[in-house]
Amino acid sequence: MVNRIWEKRFWISCFFIIFLFILVIFQVMVELGRFEKKETKSSTVINIQKQKKPLLKEQSNSRLRHFKDNYPIMLWWSPLTGENGRLGQCGTDTCFFTINRTYLQDPMTKAILFYGTDFNIDSLPLPRKSSHEWALFHEESPKNNYKLFHEPAITLFNHTATFSRHSHMPLTSQYLEGLQALKSTDYLVSVEKKNVLRKRLSPLAYVQSDCDPPSDRDTYVQELMKYIAVDSYGECLHNKDLPQQVNNPSFMDDSQFHHILGQYKFILAFENAVCEDYITEKLWRPLKLGAVPVYFGAPNVEDWLPSNKSAIIVSRFSHPKDLAAYIKKLDKNDTLYMQFIEWKLHGNINNKRLVSAITERKWGVQDVTQDNYIDAFECMVCKRVCENVRLKEQGPSTKLWNADSAHLNCPAPEVFSFLPVHSPKSSMREMWKPSFEQSKKEAKALRTLVERNRNFTTVEFWNLVFKFW
């Protein structure tokens, strides 16, 4: 009798564990699905599209047919540009750019262009012809489409433009207008005035409204707040209000907002993901304003700083308590603090890698005299395709470009252990690690189905994902 009771309890426990496992997997799938269906583009991309300068305006159907019959077609599978047809000049090469999917079977179609955030397994240009090269533009962090950050998925593409320095067109400096923006002293406040302002301001400012991202930054900042005062203006850990006229995300680049932040000695610059070369305005903004960024994000950020002593690197401190003690030390000692501002006062950017990246890139940021990075991406693919067209006319040998895992790669997200085990934190914070693990299976399933080279359904895709568990 005892054995039967024990056996019954054992099977009930097993059933309960299996049920919890399925529940967790279902939650991960739901959350990933939300990101998979995400339709909103970053404001940066939207603004860039408004600035696009086409060689020719959209033409009548008859003229479009004439153009596409004479030039290689670059088909945007993601409707990023919104252009039904445009002839683009790329140096001495010319290509026809369109979002019209009816051109997929056209013999002049040579490249399919994807925007990573919109890359969706629901509809892919399959079967993939041997003459079709795939190109990926993805400037975002992994939270927008995790599956692309694994070797089986990223290597499906021939051409890439990502935040990684290893991609074919690196976008590492995408949030920096230029070297002059770093050197500018328009918002610089003297240390003497900042010391006076400290009577009503905390030493640190934090501005985030995207809470509980893969980097788990809010957990770290929450712990840091136990040891040093932080003025938090965003929705995350909010404790201080901005003036009503700038209390909107659209005002993040407003001069009044910059004047407010420029009054702080230190600004917390925490990325939403920890990936090499993934560096955003969170780093560049305090550097441009003359504040000291307290940075957490790209492990190799020192490769991109304007000076060896221009930012405080969070990863160098074993605990937020130690970081707080160091910031307090600088806050009380003007001589030590000014060592982090010296480069700014003298306009001395001595990082050769940063200087080269800015001066040699083929695109500009908020600069109407230069191509934007989407134009540059289109032209990179266009030039490569045209080069192969010429090589094929001369003989059978053509160039083959391929992405490798370094073109888009991030480690698994980790959470900080400062919080108690049963702390009532959001489920989003706990979701990123299982999402990352599942995305490995998704990347593998995607690769398998694409190599099969015929259309597939979402049911087939998810069945294969579960098969890989």
Swiss-Prot record:
It holds the Pfam family Glyco_transf_10. Pathway: Protein modification; protein glycosylation. Its main location: endoplasmic reticulum. Its EC number is 2.4.1.221. The keyword NADP does not apply. GO terms for molecular function: alpha-(1->3)-fucosyltransferase activity; peptide-O-fucosyltransferase activity. Keywords: Disulfide bond, Endoplasmic reticulum, Glycoprotein, Glycosyltransferase, Membrane, Signal-anchor, Transferase, Transmembrane, Transmembrane helix. The chain crosses the membrane at residues 10-30. Glycans are attached at N100, N158, N308, N333, N455. It is found in: Endoplasmic reticulum membrane. It catalyses: L-threonyl-[protein] + GDP-beta-L-fucose = 3-O-(alpha-L-fucosyl)-L-threonyl-[protein] + GDP + H(+); L-seryl-[protein] + GDP-beta-L-fucose = 3-O-(alpha-L-fucosyl)-L-seryl-[protein] + GDP + H(+). This is GDP-fucose protein O-fucosyltransferase 3. It comes from Xenopus laevis (African clawed frog). The gene is fut10.
